[in-house]
Amino acid sequence: MENQKILVAKYAIDRYIKSNMNLGIGTGTTVYHAIKYLSEKLKSGNLKNLKFYTTSSDTKYLLSKEQIPYESNFSKLNKNLDIAIDGADEILLEKKSLIKGMGGAHLMEKVIAYNSETLLIIADETKIVKKLGTKMPIPIEVAPNAVGFIMTRLEEMNLDITLRICNEKKGPIITDNNNYILDVKMHVENPEGTEKYFKLFPGILEIGIFNHKNTKIVYYQNKQIKEA
């Protein structure tokens, strides 16, 4: 699958990324390959004057490793970014709806994505599903003081909920924004309606369902690169 990720990352960048763009950079293994290829194109001079806006501490680290400067201050932005490049955990092609957030960065990923003219998703064939929630739970970022209230409310809806726990230390995962993540197992019949509904719960800061109005998907399937 790593080779598929490399192929789609290179294809998407060659096709859609131009010099002088303001780019949002997502989080995850596929984005890692995009950063590596962007670094090559910047060093060769094939791309110039790109500004990068990051979604996580992990992305900042990867950009720094490639000696690519990034913008830390978003407060001066007064217009949308040109393109946000990101991966996905599940993709429903017919609606261009996504699940994101298994890397714990979906709050800032959505801030960057929904404030970009285009959300450019790159993915291998394992990410394509016929219904969201088939393989992955839905990540929900929650304010720590609200987690008990939210878990009770979701349990009353007969949903299967898990507080995401760290593997390397005891206790829950803390996001870059100092919040908790709940993973909710459910099949999503209506992605747009589900996204809007859960955002109404006080204490839920963001849900990992994405329905960007202008999503382009570059993916690998049946031994070829496809677009949706």
Curated annotation (Swiss-Prot):
UniProt xrefs under Gene3D superfamilies: 3.30.70.260, 3.40.50.1360
N-terminal signal peptide: none
Entry GO CC: cytosol
One GO process term, biological-process aspect: pentose-phosphate shunt, non-oxidative branch
Enzyme class: isomerase
Keyword Isomerase carried by entry: yes
Catalysed reactions, semicolon-separated: aldehydo-D-ribose 5-phosphate = D-ribulose 5-phosphate
Taxonomy, superkingdom: Bacteria
InterPro entries the UniProt entry points to: NagB/RpiA_transferase-like (IPR037171), Ribose5P_isomerase_typA_subgr (IPR020672), Ribose5P_isomerase_type_A (IPR004788)
Active site: E109 (proton acceptor)
Pathway(s) the chain acts in: Carbohydrate degradation; pentose phosphate pathway; D-ribose 5-phosphate from D-ribulose 5-phosphate (non-oxidative stage): step 1/1
Alphabetic keyword roster: Isomerase
Amino-acid positions noted as binding substrate in the UniProt annotation, renumbered to this chain: T27, G28, T29, T30, D86, G87, A88, D89, K100, G101, M102, G103, K127
Subunit structure: Homodimer.
Function: Catalyzes the reversible conversion of ribose-5-phosphate to ribulose 5-phosphate.
Family classification: Belongs to the ribose 5-phosphate isomerase family.
Protein name: Ribose-5-phosphate isomerase A
Origin species: Borreliella afzelii (strain PKo)
Gene: rpiA
